Amino acid sequence: MGRKVAVLWHASFSIGAGVLYFYFVLPRWPELMGDTGHSLGTGLRIATGALVGLAALPVVFTLLRTRKPELGTPQLALSMRIWSIMAHVLAGALIVGTAISEVWLSLDAAGQWLFGIYGAAAAIAVLGFFGFYLSFVAELPPPPPKPLKPKKPKQRRLRRKKTAKGDEAEPEAAEEAENTELAAQEDEEAVEAPPESIESPGGEPESATREAPAAETATAEEPRGGLRNRRPTGKTSHRRRRTRSGVQVAKVDE
C-alpha cells in the first residue's frame, strides 16, 4: 500500500469517526433531546468505536511496508507507528465496551463515569491519529548543517598595519633621539669655546693672554673622538679653572 492511499484511508475513517462521536457519543444532543432512540444511539456508538479501531489498518500496512531493512527507515518513525496502532485499538475498544455497558447501566446512576471513559477514549484516539502523521515527519532526513561563516581577514590586516606603523615609528624616534644628542653635544662644545682672558694680578697680562689662546687652539685641533677633559701641555704648565659663570681664569705657575 502506497503512502497516499494509506493517508486517504486513515483520514476518511478518522473524519467519519469524529462526526459520529460528536453526534452520538459526546455530547449526543439528538439522543438527549429525544430525536433518536436509545437503541439507535447505542448502535451508532458501537459503529464509532469500530471506525476508530479500523483506522489502525492503514497504519499497520504502512508499518509493514516501511519495516524492510533495505529502506533504512528511522527507528523513531517505526516506533511512532506502533504506538499509533495501539492507541487506535485501545480507543476503539473503550468506546465499544462503554457503549455495550450502557445496556445495563443508566445515565442517571453511572453517567459521569461513562462520559469520563468516552472522553479518555477520544483523547487516546487523537494521539493515535497525530502519531501516524508525525511518523512521516520522522522519516525525513535531517537538515544539512549550516555552513561555517568565513573568518574576517580585515582584523588581521589592521593588526599588521598597526604593527608596521609601530615599526616605522621606532626608527623615527631613534633618529629624533640621535638628533637631540647631537644638538646637546654641539651646545656643550659651544659652551666650552675659549672665553676672553683676564689679566693676572701679577703684572704680566700680555704673556698670559698670549699663552692662553695658544693652548686653547692646541686643544681645538685635537680630534673630537678623544677625551674632552684632556688638559693642554706646553713649555710652561698652566692650570685652568672654570667658575660657575663659565669664565676661565689662567694662573701662571711661578
Swiss-Prot record:
This protein's encoding gene: lucA
Compositionally biased intervals (Acidic residues): 169-191
Entry annotated with the keyword Cell membrane: yes
Disruption phenotype annotation: Mutant is unable to utilize both fatty acids and cholesterol during infection in macrophages.
Subcellular location: Cell membrane
Primary location group: membrane
Keyword tags: Cell membrane, Membrane, Transmembrane, Transmembrane helix, Virulence
Region (Disordered) residue spans: 143-254
Bias kind Basic residues: ranges: 148-163, 227-244
Stated role: Required for the import of both fatty acids and cholesterol during growth in macrophages and in axenic culture. Facilitates the uptake of these lipids by stabilizing protein subunits of the Mce1 and Mce4 multi-subunit transporters, which transport fatty acids and cholesterol, respectively. Required for full virulence in vivo.
Subunit architecture: Interacts with the Mce1 and Mce4 accessory subunits Rv0199/OmamA, Rv0177/Mam1C and Rv3492c/Mam4B.
Bias (Low complexity): 192-220
One annotated Gene Ontology cellular component of this protein: plasma membrane
Topology in membrane: Multi-pass membrane protein
Transmembrane segments: 5-25, 44-64, 85-105, 114-134
Protein name per UniProt: Lipid uptake coordinator A
